[in-house]
């Protein structure tokens, strides 16, 4: 007995409706927003408990954030709107599209990574430098996804690195190292300046990191210097 072959119309899956596509997109954005909010809570907890592992968890999610930075930049704008006021809000929103408007609070899913300690996170102002550094980092990542925004990314990242160095908080070490990495990336992508024009600043950052026993930034700067010496033959 041979089974009757299915017709092509029977094999084909029913096409996804436009409404389903919109619903899926809304769900993805809501999930992205929930992860962003959770990450800010982790940063606050990192300061409250003096535990760098919470910041490390936030940084580990950066590849996912980076993949969707351009498509969901309006979600990041909503986080900026919720988190900051005054000059910092204006500084960040000028680089982003209009904020995303959730359909309803009930439709915003919570990420599975949420744990019971989320409710014990301190007030936002206690972790403000860490949250600001993280959101600036995300905005820089978004700007780097657009070649025409390289100058804006460089300016914002440079300012963020300066603020991290000036604040001298150990809870900022991991985020500061990431900002230094993306600052070097900005210069590498610049056809005029290149990484060699950042050499003096990198050497200054290395000295500061060594004095503060900031191993994260020190390692990042050393890698950038070695890359500059090898690739650009700038000694």
Predicted regions and their residues:
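Extended alpha-helical scaffold regions
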Residues: 2-235
